[in-house]
Amino acid sequence: YRADKENDEILLANNELLRLTGCKNMDELLAYTGKSFRNLIRRDEQESCQKSIWSQIDGGNVNDYSFFHMRKADGTYISVLDHGRIVDSVHNGRVFYVMIMDLKSLQRHYGDCLELVEK
């Protein structure tokens, strides 16, 4: 999506994001989000999540990490971890490439490893 605080237009989504959001195709994703990345984030978390992302980037990092509840096309929410990387694209200018991971899946597949990290 565009790395612009005022215009976070979604430019591309892979099949995994379509699956996580419950969308059949890119057009459906763009329609329910209004083409905006922030509209994937639960409304009461949007401001704090955006502030966190930009604070990390403005602090000199090219990667950002955040946790939020992602709104699916059916109106339900899932807990996700977001790992974004800001880059300069020849065709689209400054953009974020983002990997969004379902927290429950991570816990199910890596639970033991995650517990070891905490010790």
Q: Across the structure, where does each feature detected by a protein language model lie?
A:
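PAS and related sensory helical modules
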Residues: L11, L18-N39, Q46-Q50
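Short acidic/glycine-rich beta-turn/loop cap or linker motifs at sensory/regulatory domain boundaries
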Residues: Y1-I10
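PAS and PAS-like sensory/regulatory domains
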Residues: D64-S66, A73-D82, F96
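PAS-family sensory domains
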Residues: A3, F68-G75, D88
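Short loop/turn elements at sensory-signaling interfaces that couple input to output
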Residues: D82-V98, D102-R108
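Short coil/loop residues immediately preceding or within conserved phosphate-binding loops
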Residues: D8, N15, N63-Y65
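Sensory-domain boundary/capping and coupling elements
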Residues: Q107-K119
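Terminal output helix/cap of sensory domains in signal transduction proteins
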Residues: R38-F67
